[in-house]
Structure formats: structure tokens, C-alpha cells
Amino acid sequence: MALCGLISLGTLAWAEPGSFSVLMAGAKADSVSDDTAAIQKSLDDAAASGGRVQLPPGRYLVKGSLRIPPGVTLQGVMESPVWSEPLKGSVILATGGRGQEDGPALFELGHSSAVRGLTVWYPEQQTTNIFPYAWTFHLQGHDNTVENITLINSYNGVRIGPESNVRHRIRSVYGCVLRRGILVDGCSDIGRIENVQFHCHWWSAPEVGGTWKPVHEFMWKNCEAFIFGRTDWEYVNNTFVFPVNIGYRFIQTKAGAANGQFSGIGADEAQVCVKVEAIQPMGLLISNGQFVCMHGDTRIPVLVENTCQGSVRLVNCSFWGPNRQCVVSHSKSFVSLSDCYLSTTFGGKNTTRLPLVEADAGKLQVRGCSFGTDEPSVALRKGLQHAIVTENNGVRGAQIINEIGDQAVIANNEPEQKPR
């Protein structure tokens, strides 16, 4: 028994079939020695038959990029994301990729590879002089996983594609991302993003050189948290960002655009929560969303641009805060809101007199919604092809501006109540 106590964690990990320890390959985990080569050697050793490379507790300085081979998992000790103070567990101190946004990522993942259970911190990044860095994770190929990860101050978080890829799994990733959180492109078979939260307070602790105010300001001015180019049937569940420039952005790339389902998503202290520039015709299914805008001149939680050619459907979503409006659509396609709560309330006062919902193109449905503040509820502007507005109520009834005449079906709404 006494001898067992002398066996190092690294030796135990080495002895376990299919498991390799970076300590046995020469990693120091002392935050001073460059451990890039030792970690990569362990990953390459595991590649022959597949296996798990263990990162015991410690601070591993990585000055370069790490390639995770097919069939290999880089495994830290953390079973869940962690807070930044005290900074414990398996911690990667990354210094490579500074000034090279398109350079190699800290972790390059291919087929059937994974990174789990660790924290990433960029110790040379400064809150008062934020500098671009390469992506922390870059995924391509089939069936790769990033799970139970804490990002202290990543400039760019997780990039999937643009190379061909399918069935990515991004789970339980928490932390601070400064410019971009997760970017998906080139995915042709259902990717999954689950239980993700981005927030400035992960880089507010003195232990990691953080300060709330400059990080908070940089994020709401610059951060795009979730960006979707080409992805087929993307499943996104339980995600959140605070603060942010654009929470969820849908774009056209060389590979195409997105469709998918988005449930339990949220964005707070945003300029725009959801911005739809391009999607596939079958479009977006958004449910149980919570959207608050506070910063900038736009302050529209859901903005659908005239370049959008696909369907946007929102069900059981809530809009509040000092929004200028809640939903504005210029789309030539379909936009639908059902069972939503919409308001511009902040501190008990409504902040604008613009319509809560406004559309000037395509076709619109607003059904079973409640309007929590007393500006116009829905504006059907010239250029809108058709609208159905039914079974809505509000603090002053459903106030509807109709500029399209009999192209609108308006029925069974609470009558408008004139101010007293």
C-alpha cells in the first residue's frame, strides 16, 4: 500500500490500456516550460490505435498548435466547466496565434477526435489592449467533440469548417469569448451545440488578469457569439451570451446557409440578438428564446434582412429590456410569431414609440401573442405581401397598423384601448 502512494498520476495513466500521460512524455505543467512538444508526442503515440491522452492537474504552457489525431481524446480532469478564480485543474496557457486570426488553432481536431475537461487561458492577452488571436478550437471532418471546456479569454472560440464536416458535438462550453464564440460552416449532417454560455465575468478575476468594465465594453461592441453559415439540420439547445454585439447571426458563405432548430436560446445586453441575413428555405425553428437589447443604436432583438430567402418561425419567446423594437422583418419569405411576449420595458418604463413588430416584405403571421407595452403592437407596412394577425392581446389591446388593406387577415384580437 505504501508503494502505491509513490506511483505518480502520470504512471498510473500510462499503465491503463489505451491511456497516455503527457507527464510521461516530458510535460512539466509548471506554466514556464513549453509543453507543446510533449503533449503532441503523447497525442501522436495514442494515434496508432486510438486512445486517451491524460492532462493531470497543472498549468501547461503551449506556445504552438496541437493536432488531435483521429480516434484520440485529449482529456483533462475537470468534469464540468469551472470558475476562473481559483484557477485549478488542467489549465492550458496559450501564447501562440497572436495576431494571426487565420493561423492554426490552438487545437486542430479531425475525424473522431475530442478535447474534454480543461481550461484555456491566454495569459498575454490584456484587457486594456485586446489583440486578435487564432481560434482556440478548429474542427473538420466527422464526429468530433469539444466538451466540459472553460474559456477564460479566447478571442475566437470554436470554428467548425469551412472544410467539409458532419456531426460536431459542442457541449458544456462556458467562458469569455471576445470577438467570436462559435462559427459553423460546411456542415452537411446534423451538428449539435448544447449547454453553452458566454459571459464577460470569466475574465473579470484578478487571478487571470481580468477586469469587468473593459471586457464588458469590448464584448457588446464586437462579439458575435453564434455564427451559422452552411449547416444542415443544426440542433442548438440551452445557449446564452452576455453582453454581445450580435447574439446569433445567420450568413451566406461559399458553402451555403443554415437551417435548424434552436431551443432555449438567449442573448442579453445585445445590440441585436438574432440577425438573419441568409438561411435555407426551410429555415429556422426558434422556441423558448429570451432576448434583451441594451446597447447601440439598433436595439432590435430579431432583425430579418431583405437578403433572407427562408422561413423564420419563433414560438414561446420573450422580448424585454430597452429595445427600440422587438421584431423587424424585411424578408421576402415567411416570418411567424406564436405565443410570444413582446415589450420594450426597462425599469418600469417603455423606451420607444415604434411598433413592437414591423414588416415590409414577404408574409407575416402573428398569433396568440401578448404585447407588454403600449406602443403600436404590429405594423403591416406597404410592400408586405400578406399577413395573418389573430388572437393577440396587450396592455392596451392589440394595436395594429394596416397599410396593406385586404391582404391582411386581422381577427379575434383584444380591441385596442384608447389611453385615458
Each language-model region and where it sits:
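Detector for repetitive beta-architecture
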Residues: 19, 50-52, 57-59, 65, ...
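Short glycine/acidic-rich loop motifs that flank beta-strands on beta-rich extracellular proteins
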Residues: 63-65, 84-87, 103-104, 124-130, ...
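A structural signal for beta-strand register positions
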Residues: 78, 119, 150, 174, ...
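Bacterial N-terminal signal peptides
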Residues: 1-11
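Acidic Gly/Asp/Thr-rich repetitive segments characteristic of extracellular carbohydrate-active
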Residues: 22-56, 67
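Acidic, glycine- and Ser/Thr-rich low-complexity intrinsically disordered tracts
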Residues: 334, 339-340, 344-349, 363, ...
